[in-house]
């Protein structure tokens, strides 16, 4: 049996694949542990959802594509992170490292290379992120969720594996979903997700359109931390900052979703055949990865996209109406998608490629 180190963090998307793979590893008798940041969302998710997995916090700095005084400070944080990670890896002596990306992963990958620990990295977005571009220099292989991502990567290192979906995602219970929300099973449900950090602009657009939206939908609104508006008390509208294990039950009653365009989330909607209206993060807040993801999904007929700078009350209602009119054809397109690798297949491939 092998011992496997996992890393990745900063957003839910940089943790979700690990959350799927770690139980697969331990169920097969392998040992696993996690290296992440001290205060990132990965720590909360791993410690709450996988309490038996040892979590090692390290120093980490943010990687920026623009000039900033903070870049100089963060160089030292990254170097400290390499030292922290190296100490953990020397003590735990894993056989391999699996990295999901995010800024915290870079010092861990560098530390693993310094100890000759083979590393496999995973890229969920259509275009590779900065952390994975750096990590690739020190890794043995990189796996991609989108097949089109291969054109950005060296052929000898890159493999397309598709999306790896949590098994419990498909085990949501409609009865529990309706019980949680108090909704009527005879009326459609719209789920609004602004990403792990929430979206003030998306929240505002939903609330400004609430009266019109509630004519056609009951609404589950995942607002993001600290963004619930307690002054709103409308029948058929519920708000949560963030949900964990309840999400599968809420998705089980969802007819349409309005969401950011992080790849893990949108592949989950695709797997569940939920038509989607995607509002990707703009270039003022990101490198444009969500824009690429959203455009790719729209081109395949899985839903519609509104660029955030074009999000208006009128546009939101228009696009949702289009989705309702085209619901059958959207779901038909979604049904042509087939999962490439199960989590068991992916785990076996990791072992084969790394060891």
From Swiss-Prot:
Top EC class for this record: transferase
EC assignment: 2.4.1.227
GO biological process: carbohydrate metabolic process; cell division; cell wall organization; lipid glycosylation; peptidoglycan biosynthetic process; regulation of cell shape
Binding-site residues for UDP-N-acetyl-alpha-D-glucosamine, renumbered to this chain: 166, 196, 290
Main location: membrane
Pathway per the UniProt entry: Cell wall biogenesis; peptidoglycan biosynthesis
Subcellular locations according to the entry: Cell membrane
Catalytic activity entry: Mur2Ac(oyl-L-Ala-gamma-D-Glu-L-Lys-D-Ala-D-Ala)-di-trans,octa-cis-undecaprenyl diphosphate + UDP-N-acetyl-alpha-D-glucosamine = beta-D-GlcNAc-(1->4)-Mur2Ac(oyl-L-Ala-gamma-D-Glu-L-Lys-D-Ala-D-Ala)-di-trans,octa-cis-undecaprenyl diphosphate + UDP + H(+)
Source taxon at top rank: Bacteria
A GO MF term: undecaprenyldiphospho-muramoylpentapeptide beta-N-acetylglucosaminyltransferase activity
Membrane topology classification: Peripheral membrane protein
GO cellular component, one term: plasma membrane
Keywords recorded for this protein, A-Z: Cell cycle, Cell division, Cell membrane, Cell shape, Cell wall biogenesis/degradation, Glycosyltransferase, Membrane, Peptidoglycan synthesis, Transferase
Gene3D superfamilies: Glycogen Phosphorylase B (3.40.50.2000)
Function comment: Cell wall formation. Catalyzes the transfer of a GlcNAc subunit on undecaprenyl-pyrophosphoryl-MurNAc-pentapeptide (lipid intermediate I) to form undecaprenyl-pyrophosphoryl-MurNAc-(pentapeptide)GlcNAc (lipid intermediate II).
Similarity comment: Belongs to the glycosyltransferase 28 family. MurG subfamily.
Protein name, entry field: UDP-N-acetylglucosamine--N-acetylmuramyl-(pentapeptide) pyrophosphoryl-undecaprenol N-acetylglucosamine transferase
Record organism: Staphylococcus haemolyticus (strain JCSC1435)
